[in-house]
Every structure is written in structure tokens, then in C-alpha cells.
């Protein structure tokens, strides 16, 4: 039986308030994450850090972030989204503020690792929140809309961080954004009420056995989605890391031109991510895997044209199309567990998928760097590597089968795929 709080949470007012605050939480996470990237030159100068040391500081975040995906998803499934969202926000806000107290390279690395661990639980908890506050039919489009915050946050971050860094200095800047995160926690705590996933009550009433996080590892669908998103994330993180250098050294753009042109692919990605869940529901309902296959194949197609483009403007145009279609894969792989699996394991399922994405974020820049060095500065091998990654994502998506069995001999949403 639903309580008054649950009824409020399922109304338009309650569920869209929850969505809005989760969206803002994602934006805050990207602002806090970007603060180190923007302030790193100032920090490096104060501590006399070389590029290798600064790279270690940046990479450490992804290690902590990836480690926390599965535990974060499990905790969200067990304790509900509200507690884990607040706990994650608190930890990463505290360690954001603590960054302003750093006294050495070692301190920066430890704080950055703890920051990644703290923030790592948030994505899965936010996806669990969507499962709690929205019915199953609405979840795919809401996941797509929520994930567009990644690109909005990335666009907002320089506008927030740069003035703070300029007028306050890097230490006070970290204190300020850390305190802002704690203020947001208070708002979330008072406005959002805990809710239960509706299917959980139905499952209990029907006597259906619950699925454990461990049993997710036995579901072929999960591994197919992990591989699909890992492969696309190799493209995503690789281009994010190396495109500015490519445009400078190979296409001979100046920094001003790069600053004006490089936001365009992120705008395209934000649009596609926001649309992805809706497109899956309206145009690919019952054929979800074909959205992933088509989007991954088009990503490979436009990567080739990006590689062979004759002008820098055409490179950016094709990169925008690459980002547009690869973002449909992001929206799709995160939305499919919402449609195909019980809401009680949404946190663990999305955590498992995100391990693939974050692992690629750590690996891809290193692989590409070695390729560029091995081929004397040529990016030819890099682009063929990225094209092969898109093909791998398409192949993995194509292997998804209708009606795969879940533990307990029930089926994975047999009406989809």
C-alpha cells in the first residue's frame, strides 16, 4: 500500500521536482569535477608539478570514480536513492573543499581519489531515483533528459569556475564550490521524500524472487551493454582528450578557433542525449537494440569522414555528427535496464554498465597517446582504432536477444529487443 509520501512522489509535482534536483546535482558534479582541470595550471605552478604529475592528479579521479560504480549501485538498490544521493553529495563536496587545503602532490592525489570515490556513487543513485519516482513507461525518456546534464554542466563549468579562480584564487575557489554543494544537500534533504519502486511492491505481492546484484553478472544483456558502452566510451574519452592537440598539430588551428569550434560537438551530444530516451520509446519500442546498432554504425561512418575531411571546419562538422550519434548509444544503454530489468536492481545494473564507461575513460587516452608516439605523430592508426571501437559496439548490441532468461527462470522483458 502506498503512503501519502509515495503518492506525492508519483504526482507530476513530486516526480518533476525530484528530476529537477537530480539534474542540478549532475550539473554540480560536472562543475566540481571541472574545477581541477581549470585550476590545474595554477596548482601546478604553486607546487612545481611537471605534466606527468599533473596527469596523475587528473587520472586518479577516474580510478576512484570507477571503483565506486558497483558498490554505489548496490547501496542505492538496498537503501534507496535519497540516502545515497545525499551521502555522495556530502562526500564529494567535503573533498572539493578539502582540495583548497592541499599542501603537496601526495595530498592532491589522495584528495582527488577520495573525491572520485565520493562522486562515484551518485550516477547510479540518480538512476535509481528515476526508477523510484517515475513509472516504467516514462523512465527511458527521463534518463535521456537527465544525462543531457553532463553536457550542460560541462558548458556551465568554465563560466562558474573561471571568475572564481580569477578573483578568489584556486584555494578559495574550491572552498566556495564545496560549500555550495553542502547548501544544495540541505535543499535536497528537505524537498525530496523517500519513495519505493512500484514494481518492488508488485514483485513482493506476486511472490517473485528478487534479483541480487550478484545475479546481474549472469545476465547476458548486462555484458552486451557493458561492452557496447565501453567501446563507445573509448571513442568518447579518446576524442575529448586528444582532439584539441589534433586540431593544433595536424589541422593547424589556432587556440582562438579551437575555443570557438570545439563546443559544437558537445551541443550536438547534449541534444542527442536528451532525445535518446524519447526516440527509443517512440520509434524503437520493441526494437531497442536496433537503435544502438544504427547509432554505433553511424558513429563509425562519420568517424571515417572526420578522418578524411579536407578542412578543419569539416572535421568539426563530422565530429559533431560523431558525438550526436554516439550519444544515442549512451542514452540507450542507460535506458534499456530501465525497460528490461526490475526497478529493484536499476542502481546495480547502471553501475555495472558505468564501470565499462569509466574504465574506458582511464584507458583510452593512454592507448591513443602510445599510438601517436609509435607512428611518429600520425593519427591514422588512432582513427582506425576508434572506427573499430564503434564497430565493436554495434556488434555487441546486435547480439542482444529477445526474452533472455533472468535468474529464477523469468524473462528479460520479452516484449523488447
Feature-to-residue mapping (PLM):
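Juxtamembrane intracellular "pre-TM" segments in multi-pass secondary transporters
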Residues: 3-11, 196-226
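Cytoplasmic membrane-interface "Motif A"-like loop-to-helix N-cap segments
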Residues: 78-88, 281-296
